[in-house]
Amino acid sequence: MAEMTVQIVTPDGLKYDHHAKFILVKTPNGELGVLANHENLIAPLEVHEMKIKRIDDDSHVDWVAVNGGIIEIKDNLVTIVADSAERERDIDLSRAERAKKRAEKAIEEAKEQHRIDEVQRAQVALRRALNRINVGSK
């Protein structure tokens, strides 16, 4: 079966490097499924749960919380460059829950003070926290 290499890179370094037969990512235009031999592509990514089906076993799926970034597909190498990314096994759920509560509180306070920029920043923080919670709970 054809395969591709999937690498996820953040400012902290290489977070993921494995062979896969399928990945699913989310772009601003919707979900994008990628198989081996996909045509070359560069696209922006949303905050999302990335699904990676590994080649070793049909039931072996890795989940990664990706916080935006870009995807490049070229010659069966899929590279994700993101601000941050965490595998399900590396997510501290209690920390993610605390981040969610902080973001919810920040949204309420910013709304009361009519600070639109702060509301938007807190909403992004909330999306990231919820993404980490969803992936960490898998």
UniProtKB/Swiss-Prot annotation:
Topology in the lipid bilayer: Peripheral membrane protein
GO cellular component terms, semicolon-separated: plasma membrane; proton-transporting ATP synthase complex
Keywords assigned: ATP synthesis, Cell membrane, CF(1), Hydrogen ion transport, Ion transport, Membrane, Transport
Highest taxon of source: Bacteria
Key word NADP present: no
Entry keyword Cell membrane: yes
Assembly description: F-type ATPases have 2 components, CF(1) - the catalytic core - and CF(0) - the membrane proton channel. CF(1) has five subunits: alpha(3), beta(3), gamma(1), delta(1), epsilon(1). CF(0) has three main subunits: a, b and c.
Function: Produces ATP from ADP in the presence of a proton gradient across the membrane.
Membership in a protein family: Belongs to the ATPase epsilon chain family.
Protein name listed in UniProt: ATP synthase epsilon chain
Species of the source: Streptococcus mutans serotype c (strain ATCC 700610 / UA159)
Organism phylogeny: Bacteria, Bacillati, Bacillota, Bacilli, Lactobacillales
